[in-house]
Amino acid sequence: MSKRKIKEEMLQVIAPEIYGPPKKEEQDYKPRKLKRVKKKKKDDDDDELDDEVELLHATAPRRRVQWKGRRVRRVLRPGTTVVFTPGERSTRTYKRVYDEVYGDEDLLEQANERLGEFAYGKRHKDMLALPLDEGNPTPSLKPVTLQQVLPTLAPSEEKRGLKRESGDLAPTVQLMVPKRQRLEDVLEKMTVEPGLEPEVRVRPIKQVAPGLGVQTVDVQIPTTSSTSIATATEGMETQTSPVASAVADAAVQAAAAAASKTSTEVQTDPWMFRVSAPRRPRRSRKYGTASALLPEYALHPSIAPTPGYRGYTYRPRRRATTRRRTTTGTRRRRRRRQPVLAPISVRRVAREGGRTLVLPTARYHPSIV
């Protein structure tokens, strides 16, 4: 043990290193007391001057954004007489009664050009719409109308000024009719049956610009033309079989006997026969649905194939590699033993429609009940 350690132990017994709280030093100076200065009362003359003029802000508060109001062009209201009379104030502008406004012959032209009574209020924005795609994916049809923009916002949302994502883009609708039919026959003689549902076909997206595409949706509305009705009625009138003629003669005799007993009436309107359009027989499919067919696939060698299903076990082909010949001249072929696959128990499950499925029996872990 060194002498330094012995001295430290002796000092620890005599004067242990335990320190008490520090002593506060006595303040030799007295704290300074602050005196509040009383404001002198202003004279009465100064109060009178202050009451007359009071400047709250020397300069107007500046806005963060330099904003300017819209420039308004003064438009003289129609019907106002411009007369200058010295010493008299100009009267309030006169506005016509709307009964008089509605009587104008060029009312629509005034509203379109924003003239007269239509020259006030918010200026409407001229909407300029450009079609992104004018191609026709159905060559057998011809367009009748232009591409009209469909409103995507409700009227209440437009008034509130709501904006949605991609608000600059809007869908369009266009009416198309068959090329081989005349336009008058299609628009005038065709009737739409409300009970039939239209056939909808969604076409793939066509790219018109980088990052921008157009998707066409074909809605085929089933219609019944009056030409089919006319041909059907003509066919009924020109039937000349002997059975029909005998029935017609009997009907004529019965009508003549009834006419002799009752008053004779003349029919001026032609008879209307409601004949349904002939339905085309639905083509029978030669093949089953594509979802019911399983593709040909290869299984991993570790997977045992299930009987009743397609698929085969993948066997990698041996690559043609050059081997060194042994000096003895004898070759040994190394055959890879194929793993012995255990047979799989299979169960057949009957489904609706007389279909049977071959499913493998599942094997559970011993811990699963």
Curated annotation (Swiss-Prot):
The modification Phosphothreonine is found at T85. Residues 22-31 have a biased composition (Basic and acidic residues). Residues 32-41, 315-338 have a biased composition (Basic residues). The modification Phosphoserine is found at S166. It is found in: Virion; Host nucleus, Host nucleolus. It comes from the Viruses. Signal peptide: none annotated. GO terms for biological process: viral release from host cell. GO terms for cellular component: host cell nucleolus; host cell nucleus; virion component. Belongs to the adenoviridae core-capsid bridging protein family. All late proteins expressed from the major late promoter are produced by alternative splicing and alternative polyadenylation of the same gene giving rise to non-overlapping ORFs. A leader sequence is present in the N-terminus of all these mRNAs and is recognized by the viral shutoff protein to provide expression although conventional translation via ribosome scanning from the cap has been shut off in the host cell. Associates loosely with the viral DNA to form an outer shell around the nucleoprotein-DNA complex and links it with the capsid by binding the endosome lysis protein. Dissociates from the viral genome during entry. Might be involved in nuclear capsid assembly of the viral particles through its association with NPM1/nucleophosmin. This is Core-capsid bridging protein. The gene is L2.
